[in-house]
Amino acid sequence: MKRIACILSLLAGICLISFPVLAQEASEATNAAAAVEEEAAEPAAELNGANTAWILTATALVLFMTIPGLSLFYAGLVGRKNVLSVLMHCFMITAVMSVLWLAFGYSIAFGDASPYFGGFGKLFASGVNSESMSGDIPEFLFFGFQMTFFIITPALMVGAFVERMKFSAMILFTSIWALVVYAPVCHWVWAGNGFMLESGTMDLAGGIVVHITAGIGALVVCIMVGPRKGYPTAQFQPHSLPLCVTGTGMLWVGWFGFNAGSQLAANGDAAQTLVVTHLSAATATIVWSLAEKIKNGKASVLGAVTGSIAGLAAITPASGEVGPIGALAIGAASGLVCWYASVILKSKLGYDDSLDVVGVHGVGGLVGTLLVAFFAASSLGGKQGADYAIGGQFMTQLTSSAITIVYTLVLSIIILKVVGIVCGGLRVSESEEQDGLDISAHGESGYN
């Protein structure tokens, strides 16, 4: 715990030092953008049928990542007496987040009140109708596409507290967290006037917005809820690796909609994004398996599928800027670094991140967010021109990551404190944990 406290203190220091720099950059960029807008107003965009068709498909693919992709992946990793509880968590998060996105989330994330907060002008999709546009696609389609990201991000955190957290506490925590952590960070990075976007932060599909926030939130939850009974001496083995492999396959395919869909167009950029996404996942799979082979003498199926997800998480922020060489490098780095974080570092620090959300998504998202600064350069196969400054971009990426880490850390702690009071504690009783959450929380059994 002391080591964890030291790490968190260091991150807080980085954030406090670097926040003024990023805020100043955002202010200058916002003023410049306002001046341009005053000079000439852009004409209203017309609907592009090809782009609309692609984003409709991508929206379905990203929803497919959560139900059933992530649900099956997590369900296979837990014990037999908790398989339904994990499926229920992901399924209920999908339902609750969909309603919250309509009511509050979209407005907070994509309103234009300020560079730091979207405001309440679009509550319950106010002003959004079948005629309104977002670029050259219907705004309702953009609303739906972004809703799938709002769904999967809190669902990712489920893997950190499986088999021990109260169902009511889980629902309340993820609901508040999505609105006060995810939605504001989404606004900073992806809204047209968000201060991180204006400062030049690169994050096409959610290295910061999705993976770093989910990873840090997961770290806080698994520490505050506490480890599973018997951890770390007891052996917690996946009850169904075939389910894990099936879920991973769905995630891998769905990630094409996640990343390539974030280009919001059916064009060459989307095609390149799809290819580099696949290459990063493939490379990370190989590297993770090699690391296992060297350390344990055998490469496991679980290691291969976990490595692929690490590569997918890491390429998420970079997929719009890097070429195939950059994808191979980011995949290799994430495969090795995430393996170390999930296998070695977690054991040393002693926290029970049950399904390695921190090591795979948090660390993977950070790796990709930082490395994009290097591999976006044209000299390394990226899309940026000759005047691109790697050092300056790296500092921008580091600053945005640090701010997000500290913000997510602090808010997650506060939310969990409140949820613990409201729900009479965060975790189930020892007897309920022993019986398994399928029976104790839902009155059903996954296998009869």
Positions of PLM-derived features:
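N-terminal secretory/membrane targeting signals
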Residues: 1-28
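Glycine- and aromatic-enriched membrane alpha-helices
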Residues: 24-448
